[in-house]
Every structure is written in structure tokens, then in C-alpha cells.
Amino acid sequence: MSTIKFGTDGWRAIIADDFTVENVKRVAYATALWLKQNFENPSAVVGCDPRFAGPMFADVTTTVLASQGIKVFRAENMFISTPMISLGTVRTGASAGIIITASHNPPAYNGYKIKAFYGGPATPDDIEKVESQIPDTVSLELKTVTDYVTEGLVEYIDLEDMYVEHAEANFDIPAIRDSGLQWAYDAMYGAGQNVMRRLFPDITFLHADYNPSFDGQAPEPIQRNLQEFEQLIKLSEGEIASGLVTDGDADRIGLYDGDGNFVDSHHILLLLIHYMYKVKGEKGEVYSTFSCTSKIQKLCDAYGLNNTVTKIGFKYICDLIVNSGKQFMVGGEESGGIAVNGHIPERDGVWIGLMIWEFMAKSGRSLKDLVQEIYDVVGKFAVERYDLHVTEEKKQAIISRCKGGVDSFGHLKVTKTEDLDGFKFFFEDETWVMIRPSGTEPVLRVYAEAPSTAESFKILDIVKADLLK
């Protein structure tokens, strides 16, 4: 049997290659062992996003857990997002949540994510405990889901109703609906579509139907994957005020303004800090990962807020939210995963989108104007990224150079260096470049921040030429 390893956000593999019924049984059995070892009366919420064969793998997981005496709350809905599983875990008081999803990976993949009782990612320590108990083979006498329902070990629950009610209790949905603004939503054929249809039945929808192959495209809300949606907004000639995008399991966000300009996570984080502190009067800790814009620190300084920078990965943010003992306000990462106070300690693309739309509706200001409000405090900026495909030997040589200290890249003089997770080299005028190796492939991720997109790419080109010479 193949060795199963969990990555930073669950176990993912190609369907019918390593992601098979037999391997899902192995992982579910190890999950059951972990649950029984750590909880007196263990229970779990189980569901799946719209990926191919998701319901089958969710049923397999359900029956394995039930066969071990674990109570399973099985999502009865077809379009289940990761945040819906996390919310359901908290609301039912379950020991854990399990969702069959490969998030934004290409359509050939599926995956298995474990959520903790507090409604966020399970800790690396807990994941290691599950992983270490995955058997080479597993032989179980499994009954049907219906049999386990009859025995009281499986209970179907409506996570869609639960999520919609939670959203309606925390947002002024009528204010967004009746604002006179037109909205658009690209579901990328993913799990956010049903709750968005229920909350906003009259907005413009794209890729919001059942397509388990995602029309052949990875459901990742990055600009190059969103050209059809971008054109839809541009062709509306300002009639659409904002466009929201979520990924396959709806925990990551993409956003557009009314001119069809992509608004990245760096800007979204700043907008949330601005909205929550200046408009809603909230206070609390701000958490951002190492690859996020330095403007977060600048805005926090202006507002008297504390910003803690973490290693890259939402699990580090979740750990601070859950365990720091401090009042939390907002936290997020460059890749589109953002969490806010008043919800679960989990990334949630739909939730963050609703916050931005509510900000627009209640302020009567365009997204472009709200971004300008941020620029008025911290200055204009752009963060861009190159992925450099290099040999492992070259990658290690570059990392060794970074560890030894760098005085300059081309004519760019380094004034300060940080190495929390990768290497960030600061230049004059608050610009910087960050170099970080991928842990899974011979790729170097190189980020740059400058006052404009053109200047950021200029820095990237200079650094790239210096690194590859």
C-alpha cells in the first residue's frame, strides 16, 4: 500500500491513483483511532464539496467512523464548503470535522481535511497522530449508511441552513440586497454556490452549477483563472459594483471592483482592518503571514493595533486565534485565506466577501474609493510574485547565499533582512523582495512589494537576473 502523507492542509491525491476507496478507509480508520484516544464520546461532522466522487468518499468515511462506534453528523447537502463543516463542528459540539475536498487543486484530485472541535484546522500534532496510525491495510465489516442511521450512529444534518442562518444573524443582508448596487459571484463550480443563491437570488452568477470536473480548470481564484468573470464585469461598464469569487471548497476569496480590477488579499486584509476598526469600532489582534504586505503593519501603527507576523500557512494564524488568549480582530494570508472575529477560526471566502459588500453597501462608496481610503493612510502599493523553476542544486545554492547574507541585488541595496519563513530583503522607500523555496517541488517563490505593479515587476526582474546568473 502507498504511504499516505498529510500536507499543510490535508491529504490530497489523484482520484483512482492514490485517492481510492481503500486508502480513504485507511485514513478514516486512523481518524477513528485518534478520536477514540482523545475524546470520551467522540463524534464527527462529515461532508464533501462538489468534486467528482465526493459523496462516495464521504459515505466511506461515514461508515468507517460509525463502525468504530463514533457518532457521525453527515451533511445532507450536495454543496458543502470547508467553512460549513467547521461551523457545523462547533454548532454540534462534535470532536472533529472531516470534509472530502482537494480545495483549489486541479479536477483530477480529491482530498481529506480534518477540522478540530474549535472550528479550525487541526493542529500539526494531531495530524501527525492520525498519520502515524494509518494502517497498511484495513479489513472492516461495514454496513450501509442507512443501517447506521437506523442504529443511531449516523444523523443527517442541514449545514446549508445552519450557514445561511449564521450569515443572516451576523450581516445586514437586506442592506446589501437593497443597496441599489449590482453584484456578481463566480462560484468556480465550487461549494459556495448554494448559500450564495439563497442569500442573494437576484445577483449575477457565473459557473454556479454542478460540474464535478470544474470544466477542466483548477478552481483557484487567481486572476489568470478568472478572465471570463473579469470580462463580464468590464462589459457591464460599471453596472456591476463588485465581483466575488471563491475556490472549490469556498474557503479562499478573489475580488473585483466595478472597473474589473482584481483586488488581491493584501488589499482585502487592509480593507477589513479599516472597516472593523474605523467603521465598526472593533479592536483586537491582527495576524498576517510573512508574505503579506508591509502596509498591514503601517495601518496597524496608524490605528494603534498590534500586528503579529507568522510563518506562512493558515494553521499558524489559527493557533494564535485559538491559543493566544488575546482578543482577535482579523488574520490572513497572501493566498486568499482570511478569518475575522465573530465567526469561526477558519478561512471563509463567502464570509469575507459579505464583509466587503456590507462595507460598500453601508458606506455608499465604491470598492475603488474604499481602496483609495487605505492608500490615503499607507500609500499605494502592489505585491507581485514570480515562481522560478530551477534545479534542486540551484535552489539550494540560492538559499545558501540568502542564509549567508546579501548586500544587494543588482543596484538594489539591502537595508534590512528578515528570515522568519524564507528571506525578506528590504530596500529603500519601503520596497522589499522575499525569496522562499517550495517544500514540495524545485520552485523558488519570489515576491516583491513596491508603490506600483510596474515597479514590483522591475524589482522581480532585477532579483531574478541576479539569482540566476
Ranges and model annotations:
Residues 33, 43-110, 198-256:
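N-terminal small/polar loop signature for handling phosphorylated ligands or for N-terminal nucleophile
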Residues 1, 110-237:
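Gly/Ser/Thr-enriched, mixed-charge loops and adjacent short helices
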Residues 98, 103, 111-130, 251-278, ...:
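Glycine-rich phosphate-binding loop of actin/hexokinase-like ATP-binding domains
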Residues 9, 46, 85, 98, ...:
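Buried hydrophobic positions in well-ordered alpha/beta secondary-structure cores of metabolic enzymes
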Residues 77-79, 132-164, 258-332, 338-339:
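Proline/glycine-rich low-complexity loops and linkers
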Residues 240, 282-469:
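Phosphate-binding and adjacent anionic-ligand microenvironments
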Residues 47-50, 185-187, 257, 342, ...:
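Short glycine-centered, acidic/aromatic-flanked micro-motifs in structured strand/loop junctions
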Residues 1-68, 95, 152-183:
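An N-terminal, well-structured beta->alpha segment
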